[in-house]
Structures are given as structure tokens and as C-alpha cells.
Amino acid sequence: MSETLQISRVAGTNGAPTHVTVTAQALFQILDHALRREEEQSKVIGTLVGIRSEDGSEVEVRNAYAVPHSESEQEMTIDLEYNPTMLALHRKAFPKEVIVGWYATSSELNTFSGLIHDYYTQLDGTPAIHLTVEAANLADTLLPRTYVASAVGIDPSKNSGNCVFVPISNEVKFNDSADRAALEAISSARESPERSINLTSDLANLENSLTQVLDMLERVQTYVARVISGEESSEKAQQVGKQLLSTLTLTPSLDAQNLEALFNSHLQDVLMVVYLANTVKTQLQLSAKLTTLV
């Protein structure tokens, strides 16, 4: 029989994180869990895994997985065996990641929240973070909120679950360009009645990327022209100018002829990769057909 934890309703952590970075992948996993919940469940909870900075002031949430639970007005039941089992499986693929906190798809903070937070803090002895995403109406803009807990009372060890949740700053980021491309493809499917899209080729992706770059350059050019003409003069304009100058100093200076040569070389590499991929695909298909004949 699996071991369970039953929580009955009851009435500044030093070294706690002050900033949380949430990857888009982890946020997507949380939303996927919310969409797959049972109809009678008002919210779902789960474990956040990632890495901590050396001083513990910053936490990066890289992945998340669901933890089964049931909740009523008087008690909450959590499967204690499920969490370590899932963590062991997760660390086979990501050995450097540790439990950094937990999440809930509800912004409500109550006594149960304090007790669950205390459980996650005791797992490895480091201050846990709590992330909430209001997933009741997914049509609204999603705004993740992150908290740390500050114990209340003279002796916190005797008042388990009595704490105050203190908001801390957070940001959502993409791990790499592959994450952004995948999420943009998924997001574009919502415009289709079938909720599906056809993946474009490498050349089409390259064309779309160049079009986006040209659009951004046109916006920057228009903004700079407004600043020069005096239509836009503010502290924000100075900050934008400094960022543009910093970006230009980091960009290697290339004339149009060299830039065209480099672009053509890159285009040839892309075409060669596409050609080789199609060749290997054809060879594998032919080999499979010959194998069935033999």
C-alpha cells in the first residue's frame, strides 16, 4: 500500500532566494498538467526542479512534474512515495537538477499551502519556492507568481505550516532558439480550427527569420528617425540609444560584399544538410523495402 500524507487544517527565512527564473518548458509542463486534471479538481500541484546559485539567492526552474493529491475543505492527501520516485527517474536524465520548490495552479494561499511548503523545504533542507499560475481561465494572460515563506512564531519548529508567503521577482525565459521555435509553432496552431499546423522546411524558417529581422530593423530605424527629429526625447530614448550602441559595438563590422559571401556560404551549408538528410531518408526507405523482399 502506498504511503500517504494527510494534512488537517490548522490555523524570514535566512538564505531564501530573491529571484526566480522559470524556463518556458517548465511553464508549459505546468499548463499541460492543468489541462489534464480531473473535472472535480479545482487545482493541481507538483514539484519544481532546477538549479540554485552558489549563494542560494537565485533559482532557475527548468522542469516540473505533477504530484497526485486530493483536497477537501478539512484535509489534503498527498502521495509521499510518488515524489521521490519521479525525482529519481528525472535525475537519470538530468543528474544536476534538484528539487527547488513546488507549484499550484491557483493563486490561493492558505494553511495547506504552508504545510506543503514546509514539506518541500524539509526535503533537502534549503528554502523552497512556491510558484502559482492561475490556470482557471487559460484565455487570459498567464502571470506566474513566485513566493518564499517566512516562518511565524518564536519557535518555527513547533508551528509547522505557520508562515507568511513573501512575493519575489521572477522572469520567464527560453533555454535556446529551439524552445522558442517550438513554442511559436505550437502557439500558431491556435489560429487554426483544426488546432494543428504543418511544420515548415529549413529554408522557409530561414526566410521567416530574415523577414522578422527586417521588420525589427525597420522599427528601430523609424524610432531613431523620430529621436533625431525631436519627436521622441525622453530618458527611455537615451536607454534605447545606449543599448543600440552596445549592440553595434559587439557586432563585427562587415561590408556588404563580405556579408553576402558569408550568407551564401551559410545557405550552401543549409542546402547541403537538406540534401544529405533526404538522401539518407531515401536510402533507409529503400533498405527497408529490400529487407522485406529478402
From Swiss-Prot:
Swiss-Prot/TrEMBL GO biological process terms: formation of cytoplasmic translation initiation complex; translational initiation
PROSITE patterns: MPN
Keywords from the UniProt entry: Cytoplasm, Initiation factor, Protein biosynthesis
Domain of life: Eukaryota
Molecular function via GO: metallopeptidase activity; translation initiation factor activity; translation initiation factor binding
Principal subcellular localization: cytoplasm
Stored Pfam families: JAB (PF01398), MitMem_reg (PF13012)
The MPN domain, residue ranges: 20-163
Listed InterPro entries: eIF3f, EIF3F/CSN6-like_C, JAMM/MPN+_dom, MPN
Binding partners and assembly: Component of the eukaryotic translation initiation factor 3 (eIF-3) complex.
Similarity comment text for this entry: Belongs to the eIF-3 subunit F family.
Name under which the protein is recorded: Eukaryotic translation initiation factor 3 subunit F
Native source species: Yarrowia lipolytica (strain CLIB 122 / E 150)
Lineage of source species: Eukaryota, Fungi, Dikarya, Ascomycota, Saccharomycotina
